[in-house]
C-alpha cells in the first residue's frame, strides 16, 4: 500500500452494524517530490452473533519510500496486528473459554527497480508473532490450567525480476 498521487490525502471511516459490530479506520498518504509515506490504523470489533463469539482487532501499517530516480525506489514498511477472539463451538455442543490472543507483525526494507520491460526488487523481511491460545473445554470437562503459547520469527531475503515480453 502506497500513496501515489502528489500531495496529502487523509481518509476516515466509521461503520456500525448488527451485533454491536464497529469498524473504525483512518489513513494518511503523503507524496512530495521524491518522498512518499502512507500510514493507516484500523479497529474492528463485534459482540458476535451468539454468546462467546466476540472478536476484535486493531492493526496498523506504515510505509515510507524514497525515489532516487525513474529506475530505483527505496521502500520500508511495518505492519502490526493485535487481535482477540473467541470460538463458541457448535450450537449443539458449545465450547467454553476457547479464546485466542495474538500479536503479529512484519517489517521489510526493499530496493525496487523499473527499467520498463524489466522490473523487480530485493527485499529484506522479518515476520514475528506471539500467540496465546486457550483450547477451551466442553460441558462436563474441567477448564484447562495452561495455554498454548507460540512465538515465531521468520527472517529472509526476497529477490525477483520480472520480464515483460509483450506490450
Where are these regions (language model features)?
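Signature for the C-terminal beta-barrel architecture of outer-membrane proteins
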Residues: 36, 44, 62-71, 77, ...
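Flexible loop and strand-edge segments within Gram-negative outer membrane beta-barrel domains
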Residues: 46-53, 57, 73-120, 126-152
